Amino acid sequence: MSEYQNILTGVQVRTAPHSAPIAKGIFPRLGKPGFSYWLGKIGDAQIGPIYLGTTGVLSLVFGFFAIEIIGFNLLASVNWSPMEFGRQFFWLGLEPPAAEYGLGFAPLAEGGWWQIAGFFLTTSILLWWVRMYRRARALKMGTHTAWAFASAIFLFLSLGFIRPLLMGNFSESVPFGIFPHLEWTNSFSLNYGNFFYNPFHMLSIAFLYGSALLSAMHGATILAVSRLGGDREVEQITDRGTAAERAALFWRWTMGFNATMESIHRWAWWFAVLCTFTGAIGILLTGTVVDNWFEWGVKHGLAPAP
């Protein structure tokens, strides 16, 4: 007889492949459903079938072109050498146009490729959001996931499009590349007087750490009471059993307060959404409303006077 271990488990549920019915469309489900032993170790073992739909296919097409444009530009920057491309990959970048071009179209070699890649990437992401929203509606689900993703997209657009638009030139945007992106982040903070004194950045970090803490607390709690039926959270929301009661009692003993089986998910959702949303607000205020966050902090008693 298999023994259930709720950290590492050897028990995997295998049934006939299942999926919810969907209305007939242009694109049918793709692939024959199967099972993966290793995926079953961390999640549902079933793989497929996959439904992309019109927006899903278009999103992948636009995303492919964006990656190709970025990739070929990075390769061209090392004289088309695969060896150098692999060696310097983390340092390579595709830079936005210089400030002299403003919001206009720049020559390809001077930021034009960045603009084209940004258009394709943004279109791909927005189409994927539409796909998520429409799939949720088709399955008669709530659209919570789509709106959480929209918050992340808002931060993405604030960095690459909305703030540069407010500043009057695309040179304020973020380059494509790993270390170039990190260098931009560092320079951005230095140019505007230490971004750490931006209160919306503080809120964003608080929600980021809070999201990690809430996820750890919730995950640990459910695993701790799963042997008592705590994994059936939906049932425990409307008809609390011993698992929900014990979990609630544990947290009241620990910190004097407990969430419910329903409210913990709402807390986690809001913390995750507000992490990127407040981050985007902080980005949009930088350079447009506040030129130096350290001086702003000194003026409002947030930073020590020099």
From Swiss-Prot:
Functional summary from the UniProt entry: The reaction center is a membrane-bound complex that mediates the initial photochemical event in the electron transfer process of photosynthesis.
Q: Which organism is it from?
A: Rhodospirillum rubrum
Q: How does it sit in the membrane?
A: Multi-pass membrane protein
Quick one: a GO cellular component term? plasma membrane light-harvesting complex
The answer to whether UniProt assigns keyword Nucleotidyltransferase to this entry is no
- The UniProt transmembrane annotation reads 53-79, 111-140, 143-168, 198-226, 260-286
Does the entry annotate any disulfide bonds, and if so which pairs?
none
The keyword ATP-binding is assigned to this record: no
What are the recorded Gene Ontology BP terms?
Answer: photosynthetic electron transport in photosystem II
Question: Where is Fe cation annotated to bind?
Answer: 218, 233, 265
Which parts of the sequence bind a ubiquinone?
251
Subunit-level organization: Reaction center is composed of four bacteriochlorophylls, two bacteriopheophytins, two ubiquinones, one iron, and three highly hydrophobic polypeptide chains (designated L, M, and H).
**Keywords attached to this entry:** Bacteriochlorophyll, Chlorophyll, Chromophore, Electron transport, Iron, Magnesium, Membrane, Metal-binding, Photosynthesis, Reaction center, Transmembrane, Transmembrane helix, Transport
Instruction: State one molecular function term (GO).
Output: bacteriochlorophyll binding
Put simply, this protein is called Reaction center protein M chain
Question: Entry's InterPro entries?
Answer: Photo_II_D1/D2_sf, Photo_RC_L/M, Photo_RC_L/M_CS, Photo_RC_M
What is the similarity comment for this entry? Belongs to the reaction center PufL/M/PsbA/D family.
Q: Where found?
A: Cellular chromatophore membrane
For binding (7R,8Z)-bacteriochlorophyll b, which residues are annotated in this chain's numbering?
Answer: 181, 201
